[in-house]
């Protein structure tokens, strides 16, 4: 339940706006419920039309417009990237390395200049491949954290 938990913590730590995205409708719904249980929303589920009639995005609009969740796959649905926008100070991906690697190719589309891309949930066997993908896509690695077999990278777009 990465996006939901991370966005709740970010909001509680002072982020003025957070947006979570997931390809699993249940994860999006539970993220919205978790945000509500933490006092971050007015439990309203909306639907936003996608690029075609068969492709809708479920959106949880939160109280204060400070927290939201989209059902989308940013890797295979370029139209969802337009909806999510490009003005984020931090982009976080807590998911498998096999998703982080292609995500590193498009992460900058969401980021302000100087923003950070934090990737975590990376098993040691894939850590070097993620590092290489970040560097190949123009990121500067500013921090590496290892906890047992798991890695996290904090990177800034050059």
Where are these regions (language model features)?
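Conserved SAM-binding loop
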Residues: 20, 92, 119
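ADP-ribose/adenylate-binding Rossmann-like module
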Residues: 114-127
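A short acidic, Gly/Pro-enriched loop at the edge of an enzyme's catalytic core
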Residues: 76-90
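A short glycine-rich, Lys/Arg-flanked "PGG" loop and its adjoining helix->strand segment in the class I
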Residues: 101-116, 131
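Conserved SAM/SAH cofactor-binding pocket of Class I
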Residues: 1-73
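Core SAM-dependent methyltransferase catalytic element
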Residues: 139-158
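A short SAM/SAH-binding and catalytic strip from SAM-dependent methyltransferases
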Residues: 89-102
């Amino acid at each position: 339940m990465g996006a939901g938990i991370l966005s709740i913590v970010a909001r509680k730590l002072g982020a003025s706006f957070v947006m979570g995205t997931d390809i699993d409708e249940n994860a999006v719904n539970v993220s919205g419920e978790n945000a509500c249980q933490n006092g971050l929303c007015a439990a309203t589920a909306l639907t936003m039309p996608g690029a075609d009639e068969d492709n809708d995005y479920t959106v949880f609009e939160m109280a204060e417009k400070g927290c939201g969740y989209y059902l989308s796959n940013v890797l295979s649905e370029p139209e969802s990237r337009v909806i999510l926008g490009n003005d984020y100070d931090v982009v976080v991906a807590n998911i498998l390395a096999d998703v982080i690697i292609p995500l590193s190719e498009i992460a900058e589309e969401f980021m302000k200049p100087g923003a950070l891309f934090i990737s975590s949930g990376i098993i040691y066997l894939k850590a070097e491949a993620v590092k290489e993908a970040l560097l190949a896509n123009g990121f500067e690695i500013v921090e590496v954290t290892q906890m047992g077999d798991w890695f996290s990278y904090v990177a800034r777009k050059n």
